[in-house]
Amino acid sequence: MDTDKNFNHENDSLFKKNIIKTSNNNLKELNIAFCFDDNFVMPTGVAIASIIENNKDSHLHFHLFFESISEKNKFRIFEIQNDNISITTYELQEELSVNPNTLILGIPKSTCLRFMVPFILRHEVDSVLYLDGDMICLDSLHALHDLNLKGHIAAVVADSKEMQQKASSLGYGIDTDKYFNAGFLFINVSEWNSKNVTEMAFSMINSGTIYKYADQDVLNILLNENSKLIDKKYNKTITLSPIDRVDDKASHGTTILHYVTKNKPWFMIFESQIFLHYLSQSPWKDTQLKLTPNASLLRIKAKKFLSDKKFFDWFKYFALYIKYKLFSK
């Protein structure tokens, strides 16, 4: 896909649109978008299940943008059911062109599909909530219906102080007190398109300049003066640990929990009861989860059991650590 050309009506054909299900009710509609590839279908499905369970008072219209997913996963998307939901899928028909040098830290290029969401939906919705697939909704999103976005491109949540300090050293010339985590974007669609954010974002990401945090940096640069900061409960970022159930502690007073870094809750070593609960509510409930993203976490867990004098558990995880070190690719 040539993302350098101007965005116009011809770009609508970049996606194959499929209306999977519609719901006719009198509830207020909340449009929610996810962007993913085959590696992130399952986590996204779990995120959707969590939103459905906690938002029975809204008509939830899910707009699912994806590239290169299996027929099995397409069928599972069809299996998502509830009386108050609508689902529309948008399958990318051309390869997404993104500067690979920018995609560091394991960031998939499908994350840049979020640049296109408000453009593709420009004739259909006034606002859309973009969410990353590694999020879990724990409470109602109903208050977003009344959020005033006038004069703002998007409502966002400030990133951690640590991330804002890192951003301040990157020389972007922005107010880093407003630096936000781009996993949550409640977008004013008309304002986004009037400012040509889609076109400018792709131009920046493919310019040859390397942005430390890729699309997140690009969006912060473009939206810095036109974003509205809202309560951190809508994007509570956490890093999981193999020796502590971090998400259980972080869930109190949280609306959306965001699992940042490579420590994701779909690895069994983190024992995320929150994720497992919503996984069981999704069409992906029979997924065989992997144990760990890397061997070192097994060693850390083994050492914790040793210090707690839980020798059986220590031996179990130390043996798994040796196995992973010897045989994992």
Regions found by a protein language model. Give the residues of each.
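Histidine-anchored nucleotide/phosphate-binding helix
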Residues: V41-N55
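Short loop->beta transition adjacent to catalytic acidic/histidine clusters or analogous donor-positioning motifs
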Residues: L30, N55-H63
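A glycosyltransferase accessory/donor-loop signature
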Residues: M1-L30, F36, I187-V189, N193-K329
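Short aromatic/hydrophobic "clamp" motif used to bind/position activated sugar donors
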Residues: V128
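Active-site-proximal specificity loops/subdomain of glycosyltransferases
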Residues: F75, E79-I120
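Short alpha-helix within the catalytic core of nucleotide-sugar-dependent glycosyltransferases
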Residues: F75-F78, H123, L138-L149, T198
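Short internal beta-strands
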Residues: H61-S68, A155-A158
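Conserved donor-nucleotide/metal-binding helix-loop-beta segment in metal-dependent transferases, i.e.
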Residues: M135-L170
